[in-house]
């Protein structure tokens, strides 16, 4: 029986129900419910459907003149009636996705303390490190299955936002529900408040976090360890997603815990999965394969290197050697092309550095090899930006790339839109509409020579909700590299351009539910094959996906004894 058709038995009544966002219906309580739960007079007389409520809410939403006010309004609905919030977002997903998440969430994070209204999620501050168990038990969510956690140090392209980073876990979990069908009752956003090195926040009298420079070293590592152990004790089967940790911490944390707990880092692995999925779709649309591409990156942090490693793995799976695959991927950061003789490379960068001997014949060889030098010498067919620095894909670079590649694949992925390496409009005009473009943030369609080009948003929201749904449906104990690779291939299978030869590179957001289910099935199937979950047939896995897919519909309530 569909859970939405089962009555929900509640042990409380009156204003307490109206103050509980997971069960509040507002004006949609039936006459019987109003009597049984002592709600008569607490809500207006008219009994409305959820669609009538959503229509009113949408009119109110459209009355606001700026995106931040719209974001605050939607968050207020979320904090009072979650079912209505998700019905409203479901009805207007393309319009509201940029409001509840990127790019608007970046501004919401910057103004978090100034705009704070109501508690959501958990703040675990370092001075309370000995009471983490108590804090987790304070959560009103008893059956948590997905946690998104941040320490606020690298929020989008905005840097250290302290506890203001809480906007990211809240936004990400909103997408787990609206895109992946994860019940909001099973989600919990958490911010680890370990101080901030942002002087503006430390000096801001309204800042609500711990006013202290960020801790590091052993103190930080021990705090993360205590948190992970406490979560595992409280909710042993939960999936933990690490979000917006600084480069120096992101990869070490992932490496330390990915084999111990069910966890993944969306900035590293989710970004890599959606990028590889988009590249596979672009290659199919261009009539080629990924292992034949030459790839140049601008940005060699943990996210960029995570994408590069996923590309290498996919190339190897298509039949070339690991050494050959790595020779086809060039990483450029602020110091130029990564080379194996550079003294200060991080461990995850070392495996992606090019050999000096292999490039000694290049034109304009120097100690600091620029992106333009790489384009002129390597002649890449794929250009990916994860630098967080706007405007670095210049006209000269893009035109140089197009001069040797008829259909260049160009992905300026930095968020938010103010940080993008080049706008789709510029890229398409510089390449006469020939480039295959995907961006990290939403952009309007571009018209070139009378032809309209839809801009694919290479957004992690196409990947992580499906991964989460697949983990929950299969009961996977870990998130393996093979599961992530399966999510990339499943996303590519949903590309309208790859399937039909026309249309956008990635599916429309209106199709996100079917995309997430398709990805969930691929992820769950690999988990079963790898022995990371109990054996199940394809039919049982698909049924489990449907059973776990929550819909924003009101349930009937019945009263139980108090």
From Swiss-Prot:
The active site is at 101 (proton donor), 172 (proton acceptor). NAD(+) binds at residues 154, 267, 415. It catalyses: (S)-malate + NAD(+) = pyruvate + CO2 + NADH; oxaloacetate + H(+) = pyruvate + CO2. Pfam families: malic, Malic_M. Its cofactor is Mg(2+); Mn(2+). The record marks 267 as: Important for activity. Its EC number is 1.1.1.38. GO terms for molecular function: malate dehydrogenase (decarboxylating) (NAD+) activity; metal ion binding; NAD binding; oxaloacetate decarboxylase activity. Homotetramer. HAMAP family: NAD_malic_enz (MF_01619). This is NAD-dependent malic enzyme. It comes from Shewanella sp. (strain MR-4). The lineage of its organism: Bacteria, Pseudomonadati, Pseudomonadota, Gammaproteobacteria, Alteromonadales.
